Each structure stands twice: as C-alpha cells, then as structure tokens.
C-alpha cells in the first residue's frame, strides 16, 4: 500500500513538473550531441581496377516477344546507312518467314545487360577507314574486344555476321572479322558462316548471295519452316501524313505529328557532343579557288567557324552533310507531280494515338528531296525492284526487274554503275514509272555525309577548321555528265552560310610529343596534300628540331595550273618548318612524273630517314597512287636494306603495326 502511494506521489510530481523536465532533457541532449566525439573515419575497400568476370555474367534470360516466341536481333553498324538498309531487308524477310525480329542501332543497344540473353543475333557491320568500326558501333566494338571479358560471357548465344567493306583498303572487313571471332571466343555459337561484301565491286550481290544461303540454316536452327524470300515486292513500313501548319494530319485534325526528339550525347563535363546524328551548324568564313585560271578543274579552300562548341586535332576528318542540286530537286518534284511545299511526315503504319512520333519529318517534300534523299548515286537493285512495281508498262517493268537480277550483273554495271544513273535519271528514262511519294521517300537511300581530311591545325586559327575539296565533274563512257553532290554544293557556298558538320577522330597523326624528334615523310599529290598542310601548321606551332627532319612529296599537273598552297609550302620550306620539298609535275613536260618517281629519285634520303625511325604518311588516291608509292618504298627497302620481297614487305608491315606507316586514302 505504501509502495502504491509512493508511485502515485511520483506520478503526480512528474505531471506537475513535466514542462521543466522536458526543458532539462532538451538542454542535456543538446549538450551531449554538440560535444560528442567525432566518428571514426570510414573504411574503404581498396579499388579493384580489374574487370570482375563473375559480375559480368548476369542471370541468363532468353529474349522473347509478347507471344513468348524468341526474337531475332538484327544489329547494324553503319557510316553511310547501307548496313541499316540491309538490316531492313533482313527484317522484311523475317516477317515473310514469320520470325519475330527487331532492328537495333548498335549505339542504342545495352550490350552489357542484354547481349548474353539474346536468342539469336545478326550483325551487319561496316568497316570504316583503316579497319575502324563505324561511329555508332565504336562503343560496342571496344567493349567486345576487351581482352579481360570472361570466355563464357556469351555462352551459347547464337549469331551470324555479315561485313560491309572495300577490298581496295588494306583492312578489308576487319570489324566484321573481329566481331565474328570475339563472339565465338566469348562462348557464342556461330550458326552460319560470316559473309563479306565488297563495296568496290559487288556489295549488293554479295549480300544477296549470303542471305540466300543463310536462311535455310537459320530457319532450321530456329525451328521455322523456310518460306521463299524471293518475292521482292516492296513492303512499306511507314505511311505518309500530310500536315497543316500546326503539324496536324489534314485528314484527321485530332492527330498531331511530332518529330522524334533527339537525345544528344554529353561529355563528362555535360557539354553536347556533336556527331553524325547531331551535327553542328558551322558558319562559312572563306571559300576560295586554289587552281589558276588556266585549269579546267576547280579546287576549293573552305574554312568554317567552330567556336568553342566543337574541337578537333590535326589529322582528323570533317564530315559534311551536302544538299542536292536545286535544279535536280525541282526536276524530281515536277516529274513525280507533287507539291514541293507540302509538309509531310512518315509514321509507322501500326502506330496510333492522338500524338504520333514521326520516323521521318515533319518537313516539306522539297527539303526531303534536297537534304535527305540520295538521288544522284547509282541506283541499287533493291530500288530497281521497288520502282518496277510502280509502272503499268510491262516492257519497263520487265527491263527493270531483269536489271535487278544476278544474271544481269554485267549489264547492270554497264547501264547503272558505270554510267552513274541515279533515281532521277531512271524516272526520266522510264516515263511509265509513277511511284507513290510515300513509298519513294521510304525506299530511296538516304544522302550520306561526305568525309574530308582536315587541312588545318587547331593551333593555327583558334576555332577555325578548313578542308580542301576538288570539284568532281566528269563525263561517263556514254557521254553523260556527272557532278559530285558534295563538292559541287561546297563550291557554291558563300561566306555566312551554315553547314551541318561533325568531326571524326582519325589515327592519321604526327608523332606524339614523346617521340616528336622522329623524322616525318609525307606523300600527298593533289588534295592528298590536305592533312599535311595541317601537319606543317602543327610543326610550326611545336617549333622543335623535328622541323629539320621533314620531307614532303607533292604532285600536281604543272606549277602554273594546280600547284595548290604553293606560297605556303615555299614559305614553310624557307623558314625550315619543312626540311625538304619535292614536287612532281605530271603534265609540265612530255615525260609524266609522279610522286612515286620522285620517291625513287630521292631514295637515299628516304632510306636515311627510315633508318632514323621516320614516320611515313600517304594521303590521296587509294586505287592507284598509294599502291604505286608502296611499291616504290618496297624497292628502296630492298635495295638499301638488302632484303628480299617478303622481308621488305615485313619491314613495312612492322612500321604499320607500330603506327609508323599510315594512310589516309579514298577511292
């Protein structure tokens, strides 16, 4: 009883003094918190820079569609969109057979998380430059070729590969070959052998032959009945919508068409990266003629203002998106009987809703023809087949379908490729053709960017880049005039015009600062001089003793016609930025002299510099000149190095593998 009374007393005491107790508690708690000892420093595990091979192997789950069927992924790596076009052909044939498929840009694919779980993958990949992956395949390629990937990373993933290359390049289809090899090394299962196409000869035919043999094997592997894919009728993936000023479908004003938003890549410091998919619009600062009035050709020096948004290094390439000739565009508009000012968009056939994202556009038909469609290059066989469906004239249809067959390769090459017949030419030659504009916009290849060797150093003029462009125009065997799309357009640019462009990194570089005492030998006739102009500007900026150990071989027709940048070169020579300047004139006398001849004339000097570890550079025509230069170099190595053919070639191969023999060539 006393205990209970004591408890009651304490309870009353606490209640009567609760406010004071709380205040005291807060004061004490605050004091203890403010005066608590500091916590011990956190303990961090030592970072492991090596790849965790076990962590790379996420749980394997086979990719399936909504119906539970395995999905084929068709990956493309492209610089000119040809590989993407080929992937769409595979997609069309998949649908005919009944195979669920998805075409995927390698740049947007989450390869680390998804590749291990794919049920079947097909790679259609191009090789760009000197054995390099295309811009959109670079990240995937670097990931796949990392030597520390576990050998069972892609265990059992079925795959096949088709490569797009050019046999005139040294590293023919290198990217496709590496991807094919690495997929197998990492545990993938090769279902069908790798195919390779040669863009210098029969790329489209090579692709058609490969897929014809590929389908029976792949269908058997996936468990599908092989159905004929020989029916080459055009199957549209998009429908065209004509829009009003508010981008609403004029046939259904309740539907709004919007462009697909671009998500530009950002650098580590959150700056926008300008590339092929997101070009920078640069202002033209200068556009001047480099040839004399005596020349029957034209070569332009063009400078662009980059500002702080875009950077480059000496030897890089500049990609430029050209615009088709306006007269040709108007001719096409008239021939197809359309209104060039109509605002249109292409949207997926199966896409519905009040707001639809366009796959192409919105834009006017005139702009589509001007900036996006390749209307001048030789027509592909797939386009011939699509055009053939648009005529009621049986003779025209028969002729076009025949030209698209493998049996007609020789005639196709003679009539289409060698004569440079574009789609506008065919529409004029076959008056019965009347393709639907929606189909025409879809099956006509896109106008690719043109790549130019940069002819300046960023240290010469801050925020300025230059290119050197010879204007392409010639007459074919059938006396048909052909003008290069990009070079002609570039030649007409005025100061202040804006040009969509981007920088592409190149391996064509001067020796690094650590090895800059090594001599350099440069061989570049015609516009092959372009990167070497940048090299000389860079050497002048460095201002080191390497200047005395540089040798340039330049070639042109004569000193009064097309000796481009002559004053600059002579000034570099006089100021010792350039050690030796050797010029070959092919039309000055009855005896034609080329850069390879001059190499042999100066063979002692060339060998002396090679013995000092010289870097050897070749830029220009890859079909004839670069091969002739290499033959001259082989001759010098055999003579002064006392080597036979094989060991002389091995000498050059060793230079190449160590980055001392570099080529920047085109065809």
From Swiss-Prot:
It is a single-pass membrane protein. Its EC number is 1.6.2.4. Its cofactor is FAD; FMN. This is NADPH--cytochrome P450 reductase. SUPFAM superfamilies: Ferredoxin reductase-like, C-terminal NADP-linked domain (SSF52343), Flavoproteins (SSF52218), Riboflavin synthase domain-like (SSF63380). The chain crosses the membrane at residues 9-29. Residues 30-667 are cytoplasmic. FAD binds at residues 468-470, 484-487, 666.
């Amino acid at each position: 009883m006393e205990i209970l009374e004591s408890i009651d007393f304490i309870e009353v005491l606490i209640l009567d003094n609760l406010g004071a107790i709380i205040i005291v508690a807060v004061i004490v708690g605050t004091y203890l918190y403010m005066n608590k000892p500091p916590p011990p420093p956190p303990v961090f595990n030592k970072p492991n820079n090596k790849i965790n091979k076990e962590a790379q192997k996420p749980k394997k789950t086979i990719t399936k569609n909504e119906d539970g069927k395995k999905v084929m992924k068709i990956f493309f790596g492209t610089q000119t969109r040809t590989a993407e076009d080929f992937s769409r052909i595979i997609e069309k044939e998949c649908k005919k057979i009944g195979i669920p498929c998805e075409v995927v840009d390698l740049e947007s694919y989450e390869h680390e998380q998804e590749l291990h779980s794919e049920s079947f993958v097909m790679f259609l990949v191009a090789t760009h430059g000197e054995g390099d992956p295309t811009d959109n395949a670079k990240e995937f390629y670097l990931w796949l070729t990392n030597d520390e990937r576990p050998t069972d990373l892609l265990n059992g993933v079925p795959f096949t590969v088709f490569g797009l290359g050019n046999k005139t390049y040294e590293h023919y289809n290198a990217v496709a070959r590496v991807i094919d090899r690495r997929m197998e090394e990492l545990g993938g299962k090769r279902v069908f052998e790798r195919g390779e196409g040669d863009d210098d000869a029969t790329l489209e035919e090579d692709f058609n032959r490969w897929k014809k043999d590929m389908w029976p094997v792949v269908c058997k592997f996936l468990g599908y009945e092989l159905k004929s894919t020989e029916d080459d009728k055009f199957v549209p993936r998009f429908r065209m919508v004509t829009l009003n000023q508010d981008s609403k479908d004029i046939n259904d004003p309740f539907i709004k068409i919007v462009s697909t938003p671009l998500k530009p890549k950002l650098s580590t410091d959150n700056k926008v990266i300008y590339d092929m998919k997101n070009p920078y619009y640069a202002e033209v600062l200068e556009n001047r003629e480099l040839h004399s009035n005596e020349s029957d050709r034209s070569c332009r020096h063009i400078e662009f203002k980059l500002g702080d948004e875009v950077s480059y290094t000496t030897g890089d390439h500049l990609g430029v998106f050209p615009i088709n000739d306006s007269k040709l565009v108007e001719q096409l508009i008239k021939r197809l009987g359309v209104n060039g000012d109509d605002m249109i968009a292409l949207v997926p056939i199966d896409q519905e809703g009040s707001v639809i994202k366009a796959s192409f556009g919105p834009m006017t038909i005139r702009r589509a023809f001007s900036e996006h469609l390749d209307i001048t290059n030789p027509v592909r066989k797939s386009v011939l087949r699509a055009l053939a469906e648009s005529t009621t004239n049986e003779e025209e249809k028969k002729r076009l379908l025949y030209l698209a067959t493998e049996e007609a390769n020789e005639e196709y090459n003679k009539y289409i490729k060698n004569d440079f017949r574009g789609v506008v030419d065919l529409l004029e030659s076959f008056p019965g053709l009347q393709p639907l504009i929606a189909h025409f916009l879809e099956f006509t290849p896109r106008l690719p960017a043109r790549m130019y060797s940069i002819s300046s150093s960023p240290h010469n003029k801050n925020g300025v880049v230059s290119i050197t462009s010879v204007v392409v125009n010639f007459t074919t065997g059938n006396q048909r005039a052909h003008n290069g799309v990009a070079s002609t357009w570039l030649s007409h640019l005025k100061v202040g015009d804006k040009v969509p462009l981007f920088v592409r990194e190149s391996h064509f570089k001067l020796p690094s600062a650590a090895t800059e005492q090594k001599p350099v030998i440069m061989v570049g006739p015609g516009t092959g001089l372009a990167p070497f102009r940048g090299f000389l500007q860079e050497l002048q900026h460095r201002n080191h003793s390497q200047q005395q150990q540089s040798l340039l071989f330049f070639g042109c027709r004569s000193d009064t016609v097309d000796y481009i940048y002559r004053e600059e070169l002579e000034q570099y020579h006089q100021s010792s930025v350039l050690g030796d300047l050797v010029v070959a004139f092919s039309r000055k006398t009855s005896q034609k002299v080329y850069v390879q001849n001059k190499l042999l004339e100066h063979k002692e000097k060339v060998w002396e510099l090679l013995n000092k570890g010289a870097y050897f550079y070749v830029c220009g025509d890859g079909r004839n000149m670069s091969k002739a230069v290499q033959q001259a170099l082989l001759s010098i190595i055999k003579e002064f190095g006392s080597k036979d053919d094989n060991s002389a070639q091995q000498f050059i191969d060793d230079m190449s593998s160590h980055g001392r023999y570099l080529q920047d060539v085109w065809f």
